[in-house]
Every structure is written in structure tokens, then in C-alpha cells.
């Protein structure tokens, strides 16, 4: 933006998202298929369909596509009742995401993300953590508060970290171990602020390895499921990996 005069002139602010990882289009197709919509006919999808009388994390997915050659729109039950929606499983994640260490879009003028904190998760509408790095935007937000068109609570740095604690573990300790594995195999990896390390319990190491395998296999097995025309095939292939991953959370501390 600084180097391109047109961008510098026209783009006044950059807004960033707190990101867990990026999904491929197969993530949307997986939702559609479970709702009875042909996966390659999706016309529109809302990944965060708010469901009243639920918590912020119990949102649904709304998909518009074809069922029996008829255009239809369907809304799911809370996503935690659907297969493959646990974000920690990393289904359909891009490999590049495993080497990203930027959680809060650090170069953005303003960053927003889910406020996964006990005091906010009961609101089904959801609540955002907002990190402001630009004085003009900070003044706009303050004006909104004074005019009562915006509600903001001041929270601590520790609260921000807690709201994304799993993300920080994956992008710090997890990244350190992924760098260690890459270096052990002699593979190139981008330079990172985190140093490679294997100093963690074996079952935590296994968890990080299984996350990589879950991401990798999800792409392959879903494509095979599309060819076979069977979503059950995808479930059958992924379930053993999911169970192995979940078992890493049953180890003694």
C-alpha cells in the first residue's frame, strides 16, 4: 500500500481478522452435502447463521444450492452437531497456515475477532474483540460509544490472549514443533519469530502431528468421496484419525 501510489491514495485503512486458519472451498461443500444439497451447486453460504436462544458458539450454517435439481435454502442445527466442524481438527486447512504466526493481523489499523470469553459467549449474536492501532479509528469508536450507537468494554491484554488461547498454543508451541519436524526432514520453511523446539510431552507432539495429518487427509478423502458420491466414505476415512486426535486430550497432565 505504501509502495503503490494508487493504493496509498484510495485505501485509507486496513481492517484485519483474527484468524485460526483458512479453509478450502471443500469446507463449504462439506456443510452443503450434510444438508442434502449437492456440493458443487452452492450459490450462497452463511457460515455464521445466528440461532436465537443458543450461545455464540452454537451458530448454524445456511446454504443455498440444489437438492434434486431444485434450488433451495437450508439452515443447519448448531455446527457442533455436524461432522468435521471442530476447528481444532483443521479440516481443509491450507498447509501455509501451519507456518503462520500472525494471530491478530498485526499490520492492520484495526483487527476484529471472536471474543471467546465466559462473559460474552452466552449472547447468541456473538461479540467481537477489537484491537485498534489507528488514532482516527479509535476516535470514531469513542464517538460511537459517546453517542450510544456502539457498546465497548475495555479489556486487558490477557483477556485478548485468553479469547484466542487455543490459537496462540497452535501458533507458538505448535509452530515450534512443526518447524522442528521440517528441519529434521531437511525441508525448507519460512523464517519465523518462533524457534524450532521439541520440548513438549509426547502426546502433545502427537496432537500436532495428527492435526497436520487431518488437514492433509481431509483434502484427499473428500475428493475421493465426491468421486464415489458418498459422504459416508469421507466420514469412515476420517473417523479413525479424529478418534486418535481426541485421545490426545485424555492423557494425564
Model-derived segments and spans:
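Short, charged, surface-exposed secondary-structure boundary motifs
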Residues: 21-30
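Short beta->alpha junction loops/turns
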Residues: 1, 17-21, 133
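A short alpha->loop->secondary-structure connector
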Residues: 4-16, 37-38
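Flexible, glycine/proline-enriched loop segments at strand-loop-helix junctions
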Residues: 13-21, 84-88
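Long, compositionally biased charged/polar accessory segments in the mid-to-C-terminal portions
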Residues: 40-253
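Short, solvent-exposed amphipathic alpha-helical segments in soluble enzyme
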Residues: 2-8, 31-34, 145-149
Amino acid at each position: 500500500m505504501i509502495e503503490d501510489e494508487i493504493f496509498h491514495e484510495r485505501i485509507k485503512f486496513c481492517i484485519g481478522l483474527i484468524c485460526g486458519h483458512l479453509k478450502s472451498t471443500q469446507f463449504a461443500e462439506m456443510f452443503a452435502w450434510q444438508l442434502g444439497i449437492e456440493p458443487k451447486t452452492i450459490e450462497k453460504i452463511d457460515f455464521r447463521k445466528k440461532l436465537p436462544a443458543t450461545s455464540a458458539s452454537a451458530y448454524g450454517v445456511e446454504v443455498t444450492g440444489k437438492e434434486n435439481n431444485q434450488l433451495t435454502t437450508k439452515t443447519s442445527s448448531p455446527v457442533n452437531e455436524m461432522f468435521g466442524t471442530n476447528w481444532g481438527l483443521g479440516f481443509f486447512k491450507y498447509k501455509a497456515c501451519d507456518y503462520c504466526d500472525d494471530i491478530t493481523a498485526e499490520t492492520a489499523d484495526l483487527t476484529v475477532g471472536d471474543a471467546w470469553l465466559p462473559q460474552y459467549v452466552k449472547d447468541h449474536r456473538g461479540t467481537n474483540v477489537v484491537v485498534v492501532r489507528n488514532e482516527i479509528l479509535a476516535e470514531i469508536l469513542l464517538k460511537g460509544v459517546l453517542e450510544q450507537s456502539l457498546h465497548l468494554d475495555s479489556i486487558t491484554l490477557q483477556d485478548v490472549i485468553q479469547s484466542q488461547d487455543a490459537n496462540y498454543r497452535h501458533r507458538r508451541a505448535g509452530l515450534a514443533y512443526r518447524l522442528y519436524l521440517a528441519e529434521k526432514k531437511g525441508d525448507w520453511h519460512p523464517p519465523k519469530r518462533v524457534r524450532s523446539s521439541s520440548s513438549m510431552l509426547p502426546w502433545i507432539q502427537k496432537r500436532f502431528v495428527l492435526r497436520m495429518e487431518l488437514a492433509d487427509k481431509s483434502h484427499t478423502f473428500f475428493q475421493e468421496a465426491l468421486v464415489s458420491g458418498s459422504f459416508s466414505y469421507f466420514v469412515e476415512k476420517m473417523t479413525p484419525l479424529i478418534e486418535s486426535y481426541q485421545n490426545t486430550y485424555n492423557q494425564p497432565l
